[in-house]
Amino acid sequence: MKVCKFGGTSVGTVERMKHVATLIKDATPKIVVLSATAGTTNHLEEIAANLFNREIEQAHDRITRLEFQFIEFANGLLTDEKLKREAIDYILDRFQQLWKFTKDSFTSVEEKEVLAQGELISTALMHFYLRELKVPNVLLCAFDFMRIGPDNEPDLEYIEQKLREQLACHPGINLFITQGFICKNAYNETDNLKRGGSDYTASLIGTALQADEIQIWTDIDGMHNNDPREVSGTRPVKRLSFNEAEQLAFYGAKILHPFCIAPARLRNIPVRLLNSMEPSAEGTLISNLQDDNIIKAIAAKDHIIYIKFESNHNLCPYLFISKIFDIFAKYRTPLCLLVSSNLDVSVAIDDCTRLSNIISELRQYAHVLVEDRMTIVSVVGNMQWEYAGFEAKIMEALKDIPLRMISYGSSNNDVAFVIKNTDKKRAL
């Protein structure tokens, strides 16, 4: 069994959805996870914002336009009139849910129901098209097996049990279509795995079923050794370890959701990154194997805030560091990077939601310096401390760029540093 995930751009037009169908219709047992078609989630977020603010006229206009787009998509995708009618009826039924919200109260629970419609419609359209091609397939609803617990973490035991029950109901079927991103929560309410969550869905399904391989299909041929939007002449990296891939995803490689590696690593399931526009390309294989290439790839994470805490000596050193951790934990703000000395601590964060609260409390114990518009650049590879010389190469390459912070040693797989956003392109 393979699990294959296709993102929004891969199914974003009629032609691309038809192309994906050619990639999945063979007899190999597989579960196919689809995102909403490209741009749909953005439209649904705008509709949800209108509904939340009771901007009903704007919501009406956006719902009407999106409904028309999907009906046109179905008309272009399907030629069989009976299947076309079924598909359009399904679309109209899903949009009835949206129209209902223009009359009723609207909360964060209803917002998640709005956002779920994109994946529900894209998977239904693929299901109908495969039926037109006479390809046996079953449309599974992710709400029937994908669940997060009270801590908002996936309930893997529940997912495995319910998913196996679903598959057992369809003996002889090799192709299943389901939604990425969407799920139920511990209270049986509609919820989701946040932006980019379709990768996470595929990884959770692959882990639950102990799949042979998890394939993430995008519109680029694997993980590149640098950001192709910033640097010309990049090339795909053929092999990465789980840890290397996780570091690259966390530090800005957009091709992969950072959370999707941990479930695959749990059961040692390889993850392959492939290009739906060029399916013959080798892509990138992510596994538990670590090769000897010291430096593999570079990634950058924008919108970083750098904070330096200089102790005012109200607390002894170990209590000072403990207090910093306690206050960041209190406000549920994760640290992207941290370096410390006896009396100074520097951190980099990407979530400034509670920054004013954090600074207000820590000013009792430290002089605080805050700098925004920063970027973390991470150099990733097999960086065992015994391999001398690679640190010098990195520093030599950056000798003309001011480094605000350097982190090395906490991981065997990366050296990370904080720079001004304006220096990012030159650094990469």
Where are these regions (language model features)?
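Nucleotide/pyrophosphate-binding catalytic subdomain
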Residues: 1-256, 261, 413, 419-420
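Short, glycine-/Ser/Thr-/acidic-enriched flexible segments
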Residues: 8-9, 37-38, 182-183, 198, ...
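Short phosphate-binding/catalytic loops that engage adenosine nucleotides
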Residues: 28, 135, 269, 333, ...
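Hydrophobic beta-strand scaffold residues
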Residues: 137, 176-177, 271, 335, ...
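Electropositive, surface-exposed helix/loop patches at the edges of structured domains
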Residues: 170-185, 248-272, 311-320, 371-386
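A conserved active-site cap/scaffold subdomain adjacent to cofactor or substrate pockets
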Residues: 241-313
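A conserved regulatory-domain signal marking ACT and ACT-like small-molecule sensing domains
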Residues: 284-428
